[in-house]
From Swiss-Prot:
Cysteines engaged in disulfide bonds, as pairs: C70-C207, C91-C111, C209-C229, C234-C243
Gene3D superfamilies reported in the protein's UniProt record: Collagenase (Catalytic Domain) (3.40.390.10)
Protein name per the record: Zinc metalloproteinase nas-20
Alphabetic keyword roster: Cleavage on pair of basic residues, Disulfide bond, EGF-like domain, Glycoprotein, Hydrolase, Metal-binding, Metalloprotease, Protease, Secreted, Signal, Zinc, Zymogen
Origin species: Caenorhabditis elegans
Chain sites annotated for binding Zn(2+): H119, H123, H129
PANTHER family per UniProt: DISCOIDIN, CUB, EGF, LAMININ , AND ZINC METALLOPROTEASE DOMAIN CONTAINING (PTHR10127), ZINC METALLOPROTEINASE NAS-20 (PTHR10127:SF786)
Location relative to the cell: Secreted
UniProt GO MF annotations: metalloendopeptidase activity; zinc ion binding
EC number(s) recorded for this UniProt protein: 3.4.24.-
Gene symbol of the encoding locus: nas-20
PROSITE patterns in alphabetical order: ASTACIN (PS51864), EGF_1 (PS00022), EGF_2 (PS01186), ZINC_PROTEASE (PS00142)
Length: 379
């Protein structure tokens, strides 16, 4: 069986043969040299005593990567250099390719998810944690004695993103790893794959469409897909060949007065960690040159803990459509109902999780001109 997969990763330069990840202690400097890249952009892998549900999880992760990069995966139990994916005591992976070796990548039930599968594969491709970036002190307050938080000699090919699948959650019981911007308290540790995660992976492995005869004018932060140069990879809420369409997206026209909308259904609360997140998108439009304002007014049935890992809502107000804006999943967070303003038109709202995270409501309006409103709480 042969599986072809494409995906993006963070570039590292440094020391080989170290373990990454959850429930595993590591050397403080674990970056990799370029020789740790997989040759010909192809990884060989196979499953070993891996439960069927975890196999399905990895196939989803591989298919995702295949659709977003020029990388390929080949299922090959006889390969001299390969990744053996098995059940273990924790979720971890070696960094990069180890020539002539069968290297282990493990999952355990207490940490297994689609996002974790992507996270560990990206380690095997040569990507370090977000908290190990050389610029992390501009964005995080960390305990440098923590073995997972040592700065590595990374090549920062994309902006720092609090929503990266490679970034650990904040530590809710201490100040060992907290965001300098407190609005990202619940965003760190998300199990979503961020747009910049794939951009990074593509840049690291040189995946691009530079030699393709047709150049596409991708819109709204999108870029030509190295997996299929006849289409663009699109940011949240956009689709179509050039990322200028909203098929399957709720398109709402903002007015000068506050209007209300949301997602309302009767499913019971719950989570399914082994599947890809399901998304519902809203695109709020307004006259050209306007500022669009949005505020969440109700959250119900979301799984709430110290990070919005399995479900949540993102009001994408950041000017850079590729970056992750603060995530919301808990109505006891004093930031959850802040008014967000953006000149991005349309203004995109993303709800993620599954149909068991049932209910959120929001209000929206536009203000003529480029107005920047200070965040406010609803009373």
């Amino acid at each position: 069986m042969k599986i072809t997969v494409n995906f993006l990763l963070v570039a590292l330069i440094g020391v080989p043969s170290v373990l990454s990840d959850r429930h595993i202690t590591r050397d403080k400097r674990q970056a990799m040299r370029d020789y740790a890249k997989w040759e010909n952009n192809k990884m060989s892998l196979f499953f070993y005593n891996l439960p069927l549900e975890m196999q399905a999880m990895f196939r989803d992760a591989i298919n995702y990567l295949e659709n977003h990069t020029c990388l390929k995966f080949e299922y090959n139990e006889n390969a001299e250099t390969a990744v053996r994916i098995r059940k273990g005591n924790g979720c971890y992976s070696l960094y990069g390719m180890h020539a002539g070796e069968v290297q282990d990548l493990t999952l355990d039930y207490n940490c297994a998810s689609f996002g974790t599968a992507v996270h560990e594969i990206m380690h095997a491709l040569g990507i370090a944690h977000g908290q190990a970036r050389s610029d992390r002190d501009d964005y995080l307050i960390v305990d440098s004695t923590n073995s997972n938080d040592g700065i590595e000699n990374t090549e920062n090919l994309v902006p720092f993103d609090y929503g990266s699948v490679m970034l650990y959650a904040r530590d809710p019981h201490s100040d060992k790893r907290i965001p300098i911007d407190p609005e990202y308290n619940f965003t760190m540790g998300s199990l979503r794959v961020a747009f910049y995660d794939m951009v990074l992976l593509n840049k690291f492995y040189g995946c691009n469409c530079d030699n393709h005869p047709r150049k596409l004018d991708c819109k709204n932060g999108g870029y030509q897909n190295p997996a299929n140069c006849e289409e663009c990879l699109c940011t949240d809420g956009f689709n179509g060949q050039l990322c200028d369409q909203h098929e399957g997206v709720y398109v709402l026209e903002a007015k000068k007065e506050w209007d209300a909308s949301g997602v309302r259904n009767n499913y019971r609360k719950g989570i399914e960690t082994n599947t890809m997140p399901e998304y519902t998108y809203f695109a709020l439009t307004a006259p050209e040159g306007s500022t669009i304002e949005v505020r969440i007014t109700k959250l119900s049935g979301f799984f709430c803990q110290h990070t919005c890992d399995y479900n949540g809502v993102e009001l994408k107000y950041k000017t850079d459509r590729r970056i992750v804006s603060p995530l919301v999943c808990c109505d006891n967070d004093n930031l959850w109902n802040k008014t967000r303003s953006s000149t991005n038109n349309p203004f995109i709202i993303a709800k993620y999780g599954n149909n068991r995270t049932p209910h959120f409501e929001f209000e929206y309006r536009y203000i003529p001109g480029n107005a920047t409103a200070a965040p406010e709480e609803n009373n």
